[in-house]
Every structure is written in C-alpha cells, then in structure tokens.
Design a protein with these regions (language model features):
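PLP-dependent amino-acid enzyme catalytic core
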Residues: 1-193
Length: 193
C-alpha cells in the first residue's frame, strides 16, 4: 500500500524488487497486484491465503512446541489469518490442549467479526500503527481453518501496541514493528487466563 513504511519499502528494494505502491490498504494493493500479474503473465502468491504460505508459517508453531513443550497458551497476531492458520494447525496437531489466542488491531477486527457472524466479513478499517495486520477481509482458506480451531480472538488499541513496543525497546533492546507487538500488547493489558 501507499502507506507501507519506508523501512519495508527500502528493504524490499534491497532484495532487487520493483516496488509499486498502490492502494491505501492491503486489499487494494492485492487487487492492483493481480492486475499487474494478469497484464505481465507473472506468477502471484497471496501473502496469507495460500496453503504453502500457511504451511510455511506453521513451522513457527512447531518451533514453539519444541522449545516450550509445556506451553499452555500462544498469542498470535492476525491480519489476513495466514500466520495464525499455520501456527494453529501445527500446534493443535501436536497438542490439541494448547490454547491459541489471536490478536487483531481494534482498527481492523476482520477475523473477529467474521467468526462472530460465521461468514467472511469486510471491515471498514481505520488508521492504525499496525500496518502489517491492517487487512479488511480475511482469507477464505485462513477463515475456514481459524473458525474450526481458534480458542479466542481479542483486539488491542494503538496505545497498547505503542506501550508494548516501548517496553521491548527499553527492556530487551529489541525494535519490533507494531504488528509484531500486538500479542505482547494484549498480555500486558490483560493477564493470561
């Protein structure tokens, strides 16, 4: 999207990519990317609603289970749902008792709304610091997986995300993008069950 962070754009260009900034949301950018792919006969891979992408992200769940075999809960950021779909599939296969809690930005609660209504929903969306998870409509494939396996979806506000980012900088000397801080943001504001 046109709102992509300069750091992400620069890093992507650094890999040799031709970056086209179009649309104000992921959904608008995806539509434009599909148009370019069609016009240029290019291969296009969806960022989250693709079985291979979901499987690849599932490896994170396997690593969590390997490193923390007694884990009770895992909090996962949700935008379009690919990350949570992959993690939940892998983790629930290994240990169905682990609770998976998805965390969305309160500005883009698309998966939460979709689950509440048992159908894919498109949210209007609002300004958020968490651009990496600002998705108006979850993926169909990801929605189908998440609705069968998720334990709960919660939301966090930008102020909570910023607090989590600052804590990570101060205590861990880690600089994370806002989408990567949403799980900690929720945990800091609400004690895990």
């Amino acid at each position: 999207p046109k709102t992509a962070s300069p750091a992400k754009v620069s890093a992507t260009k650094g890999y040799g990519a031709n970056v086209v900034l179009e649309g104000s949301t992921y959904d608008e950018s995806w539509a434009h990317a599909q148009k370019i792919a069609s016009e240029t006969n290019a291969t296009i891979i969806h960022a989250f609603d693709d079985s291979h992408v979901i499987a690849g992200q599932g490896v994170i769940g396997l690593e969590i289970i390997e490193q923390l075999p007694n884990v009770d809960e895992i909090y996962v950021p949700i935008g379009g749902g690919g990350l949570v779909a992959g993690i939940i599939t892998a983790v629930k296969e290994k240990n169905p008792h682990v609770k998976i809690i998805g965390v969305e930005s309160s500005a883009y609660p698309a998966m939460k709304k979709s689950l509440e209504n048992n159908t894919l929903e498109t949210v209007r969306g609002d300004t958020t610091i968490a651009d990496g998870i600002s998705v108006k409509t979850p993926g169909k494939l990801t929605f189908d997986i998440v609705k069968q396996k998720i334990d709960k979806i919660v939301t966090v506000d930008d102020s909570d995300i910023i607090n989590a980012m600052f804590l990570l900088m101060e205590r861990s000397k880690a600089v994370v993008e806002p989408a990567g801080a949403v799980a900690l943001a929720y945990i800091l504001k609400h004690k895990p069950e």
